[in-house]
């Protein structure tokens, strides 16, 4: 069996590569709220907003393109990804639906963020895409995704810390507060992996 020298980094986009507070100004304006990221203690935004799932998804359909076009990058992500792209494959696997592919790729280009492939799976379950792309390490903000990926593949999963994902995790889910911290952890992991 041939061992790949290059690692395949799998990355979620929303709340991981983008600032996790991206949606808040839009939600606060629409639903007359003053929520901060610290107020969002559940991934299901309907709980913080006090609205139904139907109301949320109707709003989302109307606003998602604008939000995704104007999303801010997570602090420090560009420098880290730029360095990693030199030696590793950057494969983004997102729950975004396929009709958002052009907007998503345009955003990456406008933000000067490197990518080798972007896969829009249209659902939160990313297991098959991770299997297909033979991902070596994954970056995520959604707690149950991080746990499922870690348990299914026994790979490290970097969980970008937010108030909505602070539940217990298995040992191979590593909670990180900032992209520079993620880089330091990954550098050590690469050394231990003999890279």
Curated annotation (Swiss-Prot):
It is an enzyme of class 3 (hydrolase). The keyword Hydrolase applies. Its EC number is 3.1.3.-. InterPro entries: 5'(3')-deoxyribonucleotidase (IPR010708), 5_3-deoxyribonucleotidase-like (IPR052419), HAD-like_sf (IPR036412), HAD_sf (IPR023214), Nucleotidase_putative (IPR009206). It comes from the Bacteria. One of its GO terms (molecular function) is 5'-nucleotidase activity. The keyword Hydrolase applies. Keywords: Hydrolase. SUPFAM superfamilies: HAD-like. One of its GO terms (biological process) is deoxyribonucleotide catabolic process. Belongs to the 5'(3')-deoxyribonucleotidase family. PANTHER family: NUCLEOTIDASE YQFW-RELATED (PTHR35134:SF2). This is Putative nucleotidase BH1399. It comes from Halalkalibacterium halodurans (strain ATCC BAA-125 / DSM 18197 / FERM 7344 / JCM 9153 / C-125).
């Amino acid at each position: 069996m041939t061992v790949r020298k290059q690692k395949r980094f799998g990355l979620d986009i929303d709340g991981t590569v983008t600032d996790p507070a991206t949606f808040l100004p839009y939600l606060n304006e629409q639903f007359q709220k003053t929520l901060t990221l610290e107020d969002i203690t559940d991934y299901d935004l309907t709980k913080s907003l006090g609205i139904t799932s139907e109301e949320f998804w109707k709003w989302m359909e109307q606003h998602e393109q604008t939000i995704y076009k104007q999303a801010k990058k997570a602090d420090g992500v560009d420098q880290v990804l730029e360095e990693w792209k030199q030696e590793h494959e950057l494969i983004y696997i997102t729950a975004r639906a396929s009709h958002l592919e052009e907007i998503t790729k345009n955003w990456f280009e406008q933000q000067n963020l490197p990518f080798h492939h972007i896969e829009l799976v249209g659902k939160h379950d990313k297991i098959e895409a991770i299997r297909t792309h033979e991902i070596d390490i994954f970056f995520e903000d959604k707690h149950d995704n991080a746990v499922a990926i870690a348990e299914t593949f026994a790979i490290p999963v970097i969980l970008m810390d937010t108030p909505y994902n602070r539940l217990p995790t298995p040992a191979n889910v590593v909670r990180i507060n900032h992209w520079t911290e993620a880089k330091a952890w990954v550098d050590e992991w690469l050394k231990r992996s003999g890279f």
